[in-house]
Amino acid sequence: MKAFIIPAQLLVCLFFYAARGQSTFPENGIPTETKTYTAYIHANIQISYNQSIRDATLLIQDNKIIDVGNNIPVPKDCVVKDLNGSWIYPSFIEVFSNYGTKYPDKPKQQQYGPKFVSDKSGAYSWNEAIHPELHAADYFAVDEKRAEQLRAMGFGISISQIQDGIMRGTSLMTMLGNEKENKQIVKPVVTQAWSFQKGSSKQDYPSSLMGSIALIRQTLYDAQWYKNGGNEKETNLSLQALNSYLQLPVIFEGTDEYDILRASKIANEFKLNFIIKGNGAEYQIADDIKQTNACVIVPLTYPLPYDVSNPIDASYIPLVNLKHWELAPYNTRILFEKNIPFIITASGCKNEKEFFDNLRKAVALGLPEDAALKALLFEPAHRLNIADLAGALNKNMLANFFISTYSLFSPEFKITSHIINGVSYDVKKDFNDVKAGQYRLMINKMAPLDLLVKYKDNQYSGEISFGEAKYPVSISYAKPNISLTYSLNKDSVGPLNVLTGYVTRDTMKGFSTLAYGSSGMWSAQLIQPEIEVDTTAVEKTYKIPSLMYPFQAFGFDTLPKPKNVLFKNATVWTNEKDGILRNTDVLIINGKISAVGENLSSSGAQVIDATGKHLTSGIIDEHSHIAIYKGVNEGTQSVTAEVRIGDVLLPNDVNIYRQLAGGVTASHLLHGSANAIGGQTQLIKLRWGSNAEAMKFNGWPGFIKFALGENVKQSNWGDQNRVRFPQTRMGVEQLITDAFNRARAYEKEWSNYNKLSPKVKAGITPPRRDLELDALVEILNQQRFITCHSYVQSEINMLMHIADTFGFKVNTFTHILEGYKLADKMKAHGAGASSFSDWWAYKYEVIDAIPHNGALLNNMGIITAFNSDDAEMARRLNQEAAKGVMYGGLSEEEAWKLVTLNPAKLLHVDPYTGSIAKGKDADIVIWSDNPLSNYSRCEQTYVDGICYFNLERNEKLDDYIQAEKKRLIQKMNDAKSGGSQTQPISISVNQLYHCDTDGQYVK
């Protein structure tokens, strides 16, 4: 008898598994110690995302893979499972899931008024949305129903987190079996989980996206301070936990494509490893995402076509919604072609059909199959440092894999069983068990026949070969019963042979009733499964539909570039000592104004005949709230100097384009007026199509929004808002004074610390970095400048007095409708004014407002500007400037400066823009007539020498948009006719922000 020799590697594994067989859990009865091997033979095995083998064997013992490959020796007493050509795939890894987790105790709602501080028991964070001390493993329970759903989608591993809050705690790595939790949890701690959403927190702060970002940044700086000795001053278990896990990857939930850029900025600032979940629209800003080097988590959730049966309703669907429906399935392909690493998640998919249909659709539209597998296996395993356990089928890895009758990307693909931790689970769903391919058919012990079974378009058909002749077979299948009907007569006409029976894996068997009365038994054994042909080769050549930059109506198909342009014979409003020049040329080269004069020439420059046109510098809106995302106010505290508008720019806001059409080239984006010391502002140039960072005005020193009056003291906030200090105008003065006193002390503390030698520093705790006080110190040192919401003269006077006391200047009073009452004091102080042109009597606080205010201030020698504070008014600021002539008798030149040069001076950017002079930025507008005229139209707008608006192009765009909408609506109609589900038309309208807009809570 031949001796059976166990390979050396198996002996090692036997020792390992003997140890593993022990458990801390007692059993009622005789414990069963099973060390049985299981061999899956004659399988097509996808070992990793880019390696597969045919007719191979996978050998496992208990919950580990022992070996995989061709010609693997099968141990004695091994359970052998012949897969007859079925496929084995490693279990997918779901990285964004709340599987099995439940938030322990949600915060309680405060009965009355705002909630400033967490009431959670213990030495934890002051903010309920910050709880890095939570461990999902502590609140984990196996969820058999959900596990079954995920197994049907191919997932055998879940990275589960508590999906609530901003800093959510740690996630765990669990398998998706039904065994007890101690058998399923692989790693109790594997990543951190963060987001911008405060979740179930009942605290007011943060109420905006910029507040969430500031809270994350401040918490991370607090963690550094705590690690460097702050723990000796106070105990904070949240910071302690955060420091313990900062080396872990962070799975960061974003809610839109721009959150990827926002989160990446935080990751870069603190040198953290973020893996960021997107929303499926990453293709819209793929080039920007690539620059971050971020790995993104991509859902396979594609929007349904709209029900466009009503043409009137259909006309209201924005172009961007229609385009997203068409382009969303190309998302993963575009990311792949841009070399952006991504992980696929099933999050958002309702069932396995939606998931696999969308996965196959992505592949059919050009995503390579190995790239799809990489996103489900390799990327999550390596990014989460679990590649030794999951993501492939290599020796000593966990025995997590699924078996399917066809390859993953075949339309006939179905999972028949899923092995989790070595335990096999049937996948319960409606699918066919009959494999297409060549069968050997035996009927009543007669000579075998060749039976070919075909499957196409969810229908079975067959063909029997008898010698050279072939006869069609009608197949009816209702799991597990099958019926085959055929005739061997010429033209298949005549008595029928009927085979009825049932299907068991690769075999069919049952009773036969032949055409001439005999009956008996029959069986058919699968000999050769159908060889799959790549049917997507042609589809993969599909051209990606056109994109827009930004992804919005009126976007560019390619981003415009600066051109050298010579404007001839224009009426030029220089805003310089030369005044208005007739029949004058302006040359722009490389984004700058190169020359202003007569009879200019330049080889290679585009020549534009501006005869009869007026050429001006671009309008600058000193007070705007466009292009801001998820909240213009962080109105929850009286001092929020830590928040930054620059963190939440929305570069695809269509108001940018609309204002370019009104001659605006720069906008100063302000925090609202909900608190005395609000957030840091952001000056942008309207570079339509650029990303948020590229829109920021280079060389601008930085400003911050202050506010006075009824908004600050919450006069009209309701009876429940009588808690936050201050509640009076007197209190506002004390609050601001106290803030600057704290800032002075903070600055001194850091100054004293920085004077110490490195040796002394090493032995003491450094001061705590405070983002709020950092901004206030910049004000004290005139590195950041105030623009203050103001109406009443007494308060205006009060703030100037505070500034004088602390040795700085209030740069700008905005609104300033009582400025005419104390223009002399403003001039003495050095303050500027940014006012409405003619607003009055819209609330009691402005009872003394007059439309002559701006002209009176200007005539006093105060730098005065007119602003919009409104997205619609900003499109007509040229007409607002004209009111300086109508009400105040200003000259046309002085009136025009109210919206061009003067705001540039207020914002400290007049060396760069605001007038037509050699060396300045080519921010230029071409008007059809005098720009102060109601009849004048903006024909072209240039920013840095790039034409972002052209009236002629705009008219063509209108036609294009209508044609494109018509095409896409017809495509949706075709999809509906083809059987696609649809969604009802529901259009959301973006809110236009103003100073007093509040309540944009981050949920």
Question: What is each PLM-predicted segment?
Answer:
Residues 1-27:
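Bacterial Sec-dependent N-terminal signal peptides
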Residues 23-32, 36, 49-91, 106, ...:
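Histidine-rich, glycine-flanked metal-binding segment
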Residues 26-33, 45-57, 70, 353, ...:
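Acidic, glycine-enriched loop/beta-strand segments at the rims
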Residues 40-44, 430-452, 459-468, 508-522, ...:
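Tryptophan-anchored aromatic micro-motifs
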Residues 112-125, 133, 249, 299-404, ...:
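His/Asp/Glu-enriched, well-ordered alpha-helical/loop segment
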Residues 143-283, 388, 408, 414, ...:
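Polyanionic/metal-chelating signatures
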Residues 441-503, 512:
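Central antiparallel beta-sheet cores of small beta-barrel/beta-sandwich binding domains
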